[in-house]
Amino acid sequence: MRSREPWRLPAGQSRAVPFLQAAVLFAALCIFARSAALVLAAFLAAPVPAAQTLLHLGQQAVESRAAESSAESVPEAASVPPEQETAAPVQTGVERYFVALQPDEARPADAGTVTEQQFGQGSGEKYIPCGAGSIKNTTRQTAADVAAEAAQPLPFAIEKDSAAPQVLIMHTHATEDYRLSAGLWFTPGDGARSTDRSINMCAVGRVMADTLNAAGICTLHDETLNDYPSYTGSYANSRAVVQQYLAQYPSIKVVLDVHRDAIERENGTRCAPVCSIDGRQAAQVMIICGCDNGTSVQLPAWRQNLRFAAAWERSMEAKYPGLTRPVLFSYRFYNQDLTTGSLLIEIGGHGNNLNEALYAGYLAAQGLADALLS
């Protein structure tokens, strides 16, 4: 029987190598164990926010995996589209000019009172029919003379879609403004004037100019505050403004001085002239046309202005019944000698709220466009 030969290392390998490998492995295990212990200790000893952060991150990872798993389990055709935000409706009409009015909760204890009234066309020898509207004649001209002149065609022709300005809108009393309350009240001491062009006559003129331009009638709008800082001399100021425009743009045929009225009772109650057009309340409007009296009021072209006033009155009342008060034909100057299409128009009064006036300005401009282009 042969004796077993002792086990030998492969040639060239030392007996110390296996022991070194074992030692290295043992050391690595010790280091790993120590690191794990330090991490655990740090977690247990960490401040609460740090621990919460770690837990939160872990929870996020779990939820993320759960969400991915859930998404994978839903067929593609059954996937739910992300929720879409509902876009606010785009306002394209006169509503885009409206402002937020003060609620009744803002009403002071000593607020002033406003009443509403719809004015009719009037009757009697002073009132001359003008289509569905009327002309209140306070001059010495006979009713027959006024009626005959009102029946004449416009003394000028508007060039539709022309780049040359045809109409100028301006404001002698630009700081006149309106009630800003939704209810029928006004703040005591409110003088119904403001230099803020977003709420005074400039706001109404802007609506009118935009409406005419949209109808193809090139219109300029001047927002000079001719009555500020001094009310005195406002007509001289506005006259100079209009003359500058006429010199620069001789194509202008119509000049509109846009104001608001101020109807107030003896007890301080303000009256708002109103009407309802297409289910919405509007301020009533009134055209004022001057007449030459031969002395203090020199208006040699008053007949041409009267024709224009009558055409506009007829158009507005035909299109929007109840919108107008009778045209006031009186011995007033108002710089109406500058063109044969110069008129003053009162859009509501200081008792109306601003939105009623803005709406009325829009309607008046629509009626004007029809009158000028017919």
Enumerate the language-model features and the residues they cover.
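N-terminal catalytic or cofactor-binding beta/alpha core of small enzyme domains
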Residues: L20-K253, A262-N267, Y362, D370-L373
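Active-site-adjacent mobile loop/cap segments within catalytic or ligand-binding domains
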Residues: G322-S374
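N-terminal Lys/Arg-rich, disordered targeting/topogenic segments
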Residues: M1-A16
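Active-site-adjacent substrate-binding region
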Residues: A301-L328
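Solvent-exposed loop/turn segments at secondary-structure junctions
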Residues: A174-D177, L225-P229, R260-R265, D292-T295, ...
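A short, glycine/acidic-enriched catalytic loop
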Residues: T187-G191, I263-Q298
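Structural recognition of the beta-strand scaffold that forms the well-ordered cores
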Residues: L168-H171, T219-H221, V254-D257, M286-C289, ...
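Alpha-helical scaffolding within the catalytic cores
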Residues: R239-V242, N267-C275, V327-F333
